């Protein structure tokens, strides 16, 4: 489960492009902004473009809590454009970027039954180790054995 890569002290001027590179093994990408990481009352929005400059995702709401998710993104550079929609001049922000691959990071353990029965409930437990304090992490859980399973399940952990 990788920690978010953050860009601190960027200013919204009104548009700030940031480049993230997805590798051939990237299975999931998430780009997030959080209200707590901007000045109170700010409204910033986000667009994500692939290496061909095609829009692949956007998020714009009345706040600064924005998120774009890409499942199995093509390898290449992605440009994230953060725009100040409702800010008073320049406003610092933090962009959180996660690029998940198929390899386990070794800091999340999943305990689940070996099989499931249609129509019945089961318990799946997650435990975490070695996570740094004050960090946002993102991971995924993949399922096997049957078609139609929700794969992957995305898990975000914010450590105190």
Give the location of each predicted region.
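Noncatalytic accessory or regulatory domains flanking protease catalytic cores in secreted, cell-surface
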Residues: 47-96
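Feature for long, exposed domains in two main contexts
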Residues: 1, 24-25, 73, 83-160
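Exposed aromatic-hydrophobic patches
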Residues: 17-19, 65-71, 125-127
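Acidic, Ser/Thr/Pro-rich low-complexity intrinsically disordered segments
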Residues: 6-54, 131, 140
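Extracellular beta-rich ligand/substrate-recognition surface
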Residues: 1-13, 56-62, 115
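Short, solvent-exposed aromatic-acidic interface loops
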Residues: 36, 61-64, 155-160
């Amino acid at each position: 489960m990788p920690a978010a890569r953050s860009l601190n002290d960027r200013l919204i001027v009104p548009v700030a492009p940031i480049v993230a590179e997805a590798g051939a093994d990237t299975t999931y990408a998430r780009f997030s902004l959080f209200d707590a990481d901007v000045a109170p009352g700010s409204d910033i929005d986000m667009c994500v473009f692939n290496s061909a400059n095609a829009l692949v995702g956007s998020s714009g709401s009345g706040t600064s809590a924005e998120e774009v998710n890409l499942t199995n993104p093509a390898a290449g550079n992605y440009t994230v454009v953060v725009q100040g929609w409702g800010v008073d001049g320049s406003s610092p922000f933090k962009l959180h970027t996660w690029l998940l691959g198929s390899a386990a990071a070794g800091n999340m353990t999943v305990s689940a039954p070996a099989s499931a029965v249609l129509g019945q409930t089961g318990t799946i437990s997650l435990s975490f180790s070695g996570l740094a304090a004050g960090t946002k992490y993102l991971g995924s859980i993949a399922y096997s054995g049957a078609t139609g399973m929700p794969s992957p399940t995305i898990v975000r952990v914010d450590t105190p």
